[in-house]
Design a protein with these regions (language model features):
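Leloir-type glycosyltransferase catalytic cores
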Residues: 106, 113-123
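Glycine-centered loop/turn positions within well-structured domains
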Residues: 70, 74, 78-80, 88
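Flexible, glycine/small-residue-enriched loop-and-beta-strand segment within the central core
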Residues: 1-58
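Conserved catalytic-core motifs of eukaryotic protein kinase domains, centered on the activation segment
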Residues: 92-93
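C-terminal amphipathic helix plus adjacent low-complexity
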Residues: 123-143
């Protein structure tokens, strides 16, 4: 925002403002494209609670949970649960070994048929991982 101007309202610095404009030329260039180092990267299957704030440049790992109203100022690891102001680690959703397996499985890349066939395993992490290993082993034996 142009904090150096009398008003920060776009009608005073953009000639093509959607609502109304009082100027004939642009006096301030908005950031049209944000550089990658300012982008927030959100992994797969992430849950972000209502009103959470995520600082620019932050990476949220796969399977992470951000509590409602949290202020995230640091990267969040995969399958971490964070909450608070500033956000802090509450706990991990799964054990280190389970997290490694889930990141290897990448279930979010599976097609709908695979998800339908294996959806009932999603309620038990160990059963899910075991099922995937069985499928992987049988697939490797066929090769």
């Amino acid at each position: 925002h142009p904090v150096h101007m009398i008003s920060t309202a776009p009608c005073f610095y953009h000639k093509e403002n959607r609502l109304k404009t009082f100027v004939n030329e642009d006096y301030y260039d908005d950031l049209k494209y944000v550089e990658d180092n300012y982008s927030v990267i959100i992994g797969n299957d992430v849950w972000i609670g209502s009103g959470a704030y995520i600082k620019s440049g932050i990476r949220i790992g796969d399977g992470a949970v951000i509590g409602a109203g949290a202020v995230v100022t640091k990267d969040v690891e995969p399958y971490a649960i964070v909450a608070g102001v500033p956000a802090r680690l509450i706990r991990y959703r799964f054990s280190k070994e389970q997290i490694e397996s889930l990141l290897h499985i990448k279930w979010w890349d599976k097609d709908d048929d695979w998800l339908k066939e294996n959806g009932h395993y999603f309620s038990d992490a160990n059963g899910f991982i075991s099922r995937f290993r069985q499928l992987e082993d049988s697939s490797n034996r066929r090769k």
